[in-house]
């Protein structure tokens, strides 16, 4: 299916606001129309190359979080670069995401995108968000300060002390 290009002459900020609206509509075809063919999208956990990979990522995300919503909290445009601080909410209740079965838990995560627009299309995006917070919210990691969290930290610290002792003995 051909990808429609955004209207000519649209500022980078307007293009990004339009893309965020498409995210909330879960309209992957509209998103494809805002991405360059060779887009590079860097998330903390994966780097995606090209429209097809990025589209696949969002299709999987939308299937995993059917009530996905992302709100722009702040947007700064400087020429071809746009910085967006956002808040994502939803429920991890659909299909598995990145190998993680749906937990039924609510999500509320803040993040920042640094997008570069070239020739009227998103050429790259660097995404930053708190992966530990996300993992705790879906139940992949124990809650901060919980018994499970304290046990995991104690086990890790014990391991580090043992490794330090082994290094000392090898000297």
Where are these regions (language model features)?
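C-terminal and inter-domain tail/linker signature
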Residues: 1-171
């Amino acid at each position: 299916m051909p990808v429609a290009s955004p209207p000519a002459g649209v500022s980078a900020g307007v293009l990004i606001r339009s893309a965020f609206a498409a995210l909330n509509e879960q309209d992957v075809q509209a998103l494809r129309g805002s991405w360059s063919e060779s887009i590079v999208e860097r998330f903390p956990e994966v780097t995606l190359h090209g429209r097809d990979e990025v589209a696949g990522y969002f299709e999987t995300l939308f299937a995993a979080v059917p009530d996905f919503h992302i709100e722009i909290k702040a947007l700064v445009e400087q020429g071809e670069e746009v910085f967006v601080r956002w808040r994502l909410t939803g429920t991890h209740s659909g299909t598995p995401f990145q190998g993680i079965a749906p937990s039924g838990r609510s999500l509320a995560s803040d993040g920042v995108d640094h997008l570069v627009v070239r020739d009227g299309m998103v050429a790259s995006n660097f995404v930053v968000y708190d992966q530990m917070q996300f993992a705790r919210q879906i139940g992949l990691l124990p809650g901060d300060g919980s018994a499970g969290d304290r046990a995991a930290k104690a086990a890790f610290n014990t391991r580090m002390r043992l490794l330090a002792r082994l290094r000392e003995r090898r000297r």
